[in-house]
Amino acid sequence: MGIKHLFQVIQENAPDAIKAGDIKNHFGRKVAIDASMSIYSFLIAVRSEGQQLMSESGETTSHLMGMFYRTLRMVDNGIKPLYVFDGAPPKLKSGELAKRTARKAEATEAHEEAKETGTAEDVEKFSRRTVRVTREHNAECKKLLKLMGIPYIDAPTEAEAQCAVLARAGKVYAAASEDMDTLCFEAPILLRHLTFSEQRKEPIQEIHLNRTLEGLGMDRKQFIDLCILLGCDYLEPIPKVGPNTALKLIREHGSLEKVVEAIENDPKKKYVIPEDWPYQDARELFLHPDVREADHPECDFKWEAPDVEALVEFLVKDKGFNEDRVRNGAARLQKNLKTAQQSRLEGFFKPVARTDEEKASLKRKHDEKLQEQKKRKKEEAKAKKEAKAKPRGAA
């Protein structure tokens, strides 16, 4: 799920943190990819007539089709992908996972009913809601990656957190995931839409954490508190607290402790904190996740030549893929992984940190922009009020 409405908050309040561009812009870069999120998206998106792709023996192959061709697309564009798989989820996440399981069970029931009485659209809608990444899906994708010569590692817990460690250490350029909580784990750069199909024509979103914090006028701890208020995988959100209110509360009070205190002491009781809401534990999971350091032996990885005949055996003979396409893909892998070895010019230079004066200037511009937005909203509200009060037929 990630963080509810976080992209919207960044887009509206720290627009300079987001850069949209073509996949070709990332030529020569190594990227750590959240594998589980990618596989989930493949199971949902790679379909035929609303149903997941199947082999002749009735096995699902959408995850393998997506993994093979989307990885090929990245390598064709000079990107060197590293996939990171989830480990065991943190205990605090079990409540959210239980809710997801219950929702999927309801969707499965609704899917069966829709097949009997509903439209084709109903069937597809509920079918997508039943999707779950299994151990078998993960195991088959790992086997495929190994045969393709693409490295992968297993995270102790959250894949996004492990991707962030590798990005901070400079072993990869960025972490790639659709989950915005990757920023909470201190990934310097988050790439979104990297594993989308070319047909969707979605630009790659590049989100910079330092510019996000500067634009919001927050430190990392306050940013995490904001994300918890918005709604994360570990806790249910506070009812009636939307993105604008969450941002206002953190800016006004500075921390979740003070936000909770203000809510509990509010005589109007406008908001109610859920009974079991261990926000400090959630914050700790973001600040100190269970990860392996970048120099750990299990974080070593390298790209190798694909095993063409084993790929054909697995994808063509076992899973029913087209042999010509698989062999063509393997040839592209061999050629383009060598090409991706070329270094980008940016690798020879270190970015220059902003001075205190530059940071102060940015903050001042941001505050002025906020004041201008508030002023404009007041004027718009006043104009609407006057328009409503104006009698009909008046000139």
UniProtKB/Swiss-Prot annotation:
Top-rank lineage group of the source organism: Eukaryota
Residues annotated as binding Mg(2+) 1: 34, 86, 158, 160
Segments for region (I-domain): 122-253
SUPFAM superfamilies: 5' to 3' exonuclease, C-terminal subdomain (SSF47807), PIN domain-like (SSF88723)
GO molecular function annotations of the record: 5'-3' exonuclease activity; 5'-flap endonuclease activity; DNA binding; magnesium ion binding
Residue segments, region N-domain: 1-104
One Gene Ontology cellular component annotation held by this UniProt entry: nucleoplasm
Name under which the protein is recorded: Flap endonuclease 1
Protein source organism: Neosartorya fischeri (strain ATCC 1020 / DSM 3700 / CBS 544.65 / FGSC A1164 / JCM 1740 / NRRL 181 / WB 181)
Taxon lineage: Eukaryota, Fungi, Dikarya, Ascomycota, Pezizomycotina
Gene responsible for this protein: fen1
